[in-house]
A protein has these predicted regions:
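Pre-Walker A (Motif I) flank of P-loop NTPase domains
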Residues: 4-8, 124
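Hydrophobic anchor at the beta1->P-loop junction of P-loop NTPases
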Residues: 11
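P-loop (Walker A) phosphate-binding loop of NTP-binding proteins
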Residues: 14
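Conserved lysine of the Walker
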Residues: 19
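Hydrophobic positions on the alpha1 helix immediately C-terminal to the Walker A/P-loop
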Residues: 22
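N-terminal phosphate/diphosphate-binding loop that engages ATP/GTP or pyrophosphate donors
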Residues: 29-93
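Small-molecule kinase domains that catalyze NTP-dependent phosphoryl transfer to phosphate-bearing small molecules
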Residues: 67, 118-124, 132-137, 141, ...
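ATP-dependent NMP and nucleoside kinases share a basic, alpha-helical "lid"
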Residues: 89-166
């Protein structure tokens, strides 16, 4: 394994491009701390749903801002997302949460809360994190930025398979429609819209295995930082 300096690696991209899986494997391979910003947004969404801070029409209550002050979201053993002492990893990946995470993530004070949480968790340095605006907004000075993309149908199939594996009963057409709707909302919101940072390296993993993705990023790191394998 190559030794790399204590840097911040930002991984951005559309939903279901495999950002989390990729970032987790990069963290494992290079002994980095992994932070999943998307899980925090999903955790806030679940919290809002359970406490009636968002309705069926995706209208977010102003009371959520004050309620966030007492919300404890963190990552437990294995990188699972927890709300207090409760593991919510499976719940935040449900279709119900997926359908409302974009409206929640578009709220400026929610984005500020997540950003502050990420900076707190990343204070020790040597981290890799994934999301929609890590390299453009949260950590614009990250030493390495990667923007992940894949074909719509490939991304929808990944999400469909993930939901099936967790005991869900998804409909592929609904998953695909939800994915495209989220893409539109994420890229058109007024606060920190989804976009590729000018200095980000693009990774289209539509037809790549994880081993191929890791080989790609290792070559990128070696070339960018002048390291020998």
């Amino acid at each position: 394994m190559i030794e790399i300096p204590d840097i911040t690696i930002a991984v951005d991209g559309c939903s279901s491009t495999g950002k989390s899986s990729f970032a987790k494997e990069v963290a494992k391979k290079f002994n980095f701390l992994y932070l999943d910003s998307g899980a925090l947004y999903r955790g806030v969404t679940l919290f809002a749903q359970e406490n009636a801070y968002i309705d069926a029409g995706n209208v977010v209550s102003d009371d959520l801002e004050t309620a966030l002050e007492a919300l404890d979201l963190h990552f437990g053993e294995g990188g699972v997302c927890c709300m207090g002492d409760r593991c919510i990893e499976a719940e935040i990946r449900s279709m119900g949460v997926s359908s409302q995470v974009s409206p929640i993530a578009a709220v400026p004070y929610v984005r500020n809360w997540v950003d502050e949480r990420l900076h707190f968790l990343a204070a020790s340095g040597r981290v890799v994190m994934d999301g929609r605006d890590i390299g453009t907004s949260v950590f614009p000075n990250a030493e390495l930025k990667i923007y992940m993309t894949a074909r719509d149908e490939v991304r929808a199939q990944r999400r469909f398979d993930e939901m099936k594996a967790k005991g869900g009963n998804p409909v592929f057409e609904e998953v695909l429609a939800n994915l495209r709707e989220r893409d539109y909302i994420d890229s058109h919101r007024s606060t920190s819209p989804l976009r590729k940072a000018e200095d980000a390296f693009e990774l289209d993993n539509s037809d790549m295995t994880m081993a191929e993705e890791l080989s790609w990023v290792q070559g990128l790191i070696q070339g960018r930082f002048g390291l020998l394998g």
